[in-house]
A protein has these predicted regions:
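N-terminal interaction/assembly modules
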Residues: 1-127, 132-134, 138-171
């Protein structure tokens, strides 16, 4: 019975459901990348090949995975600037990866609404780490979002402008 409640009822919910599954897999792939030291290409072929039949999902996941890796230094610098009394190296790996995914979406995926990126990162942290991790990820990403918005570094368009505060700033 529980499964039926989690299944999507509309095309929009189906896309959201797929995207959540993709983000979960990307988190797992980034974890494997950190732990194994294998190349991104190997990780993609080994852990993401089952998504190749759905081209849109595969491209989103591949792009998210590679964007985190390609921009990891900048992403980590942004995260480090918002974690007071912590060093990024001391964060739980899952929390760090969830934050990286959230920051990557905020910075490099202009079509994704900021609230979606933040919420999805929170859900990843809660599912794969702890309930407290969700609150931590929420606080850090909220601070990052506010700074990006205030400094004009939040480049959102299309669906990414669903956030009313962004729409007002652009008008």
């Amino acid at each position: 019975m529980r499964i039926e409640k989690e299944l999507p009822n509309s095309e929009y919910e189906e896309v959201s459901f797929k995207r959540r599954l993709i983000r979960e897999r990307v988190l797992q792939m980034l974890y494997a990348y950190e732990i194994s030291g294998n190349s991104p290409e190997f990780i993609l072929s080994d852990l993401f090949s089952d998504f190749q039949s759905d081209k849109e999902s595969y491209e989103f996941g591949k792009s998210l995975f590679l964007s985190v890796i390609e921009n990891i230094d900048e992403i980590d610098r942004i995260i480090a600037s918002k974690i007071k009394n912590w060093e990024i190296e001391r964060l739980a790996l899952i929390d760090k990866i969830a934050l990286r995914i959230g920051v990557c979406e905020l910075k490099y995926f202009p079509e994704i609404p900021p609230k979606v990126s933040i919420n999805e990162a929170i859900e990843l942290a809660k599912k794969f780490s702890t309930e407290r991790s969700g609150k931590f990820v929420n606080g850090v990403l909220d601070a990052i979002y506010n700074e990006l918005r205030e400094t004009g570094q939040l480049n959102k368009y299309g669906r990414g402008l669903i956030d009313k505060s962004l729409r007002k700033e652009r008008d």
